[in-house]
C-alpha cells in the first residue's frame, strides 16, 4: 500500500514600498509497504511476477493430499477453509527449491517512510530607487527510513532464523545568499550591476543495522532479535562559499 500527505504555505508581505519579505514552507510524507526487500528486482527469487512465470503449474501453491487432492491444514488434516491452507514451500522440488514467492509475499514486510521538508524565506530592501538589497535563505531536509523483515520459514530469512534490518538516512542542505543590485538609466543607456555572496552546506547521515534469530513472531523491532549481524554508520559533509558579480 501507499500513503502520501503533503502541505504547503506561501506568504508574502509588502508593508511599505521599500520593504518586502516572504516565507514558503512545504512538507511531504510518504509511507509505503512492500512484501519483500527484493520484490523490485526482476531476477530475484522473491519477485512474485518472476516466480509465477517460471514456476511449472505441476507444483502446488498449498499443501494437499496427493491421493484425494484435498487441501491440508497445519495438522495435516483435510480442510475446505482457505484460511487454514498452508503454503507448500517445503520439500525437494527441482524448480526454485526452498523458495515460495507467494508465501514470502505474505510473511515478509518492508516499510519505507520518507519525509521531505523545504523552506525558503527572503527579505528585500530598496533604500533608494534602483538599489535593492536582498537576502535569501533556503533549507531542505529529507528523512528516509526503511525497515525490512524476512521470515524464518522460507526464503532468505531462514538462515537467521528470521532477520530484521533497518536503515535511516538524513540529507540536509542549506543555502544563504546576499545580493546587491543596482540599475540606472541615463539617456538611451541602461546600466545594471549585481554583487553577491553565497554560503552552501550539505550534510548526509547514514545508519544501518541488522539482527537475526527472531524470538517472538509478529514483533518487528531489534529487541526481538538476538544476534547483531551488521551495524554501520557514517556522515558526509560539504561546505562552500562564493562571491560573484555582473555588470551589464
Language model segments and positions:
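Active-site and adjacent substrate-binding regions of carbohydrate-active enzymes
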Residues: 130
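Transmembrane beta-barrel architecture of outer membranes
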Residues: 2-8, 242
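Outer-membrane beta-barrel architecture
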Residues: 10, 120-122, 126, 179-181, ...
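Surface-exposed loop/interface segments of Gram-negative outer-membrane beta-barrel transport/assembly proteins
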Residues: 12-116, 134-242
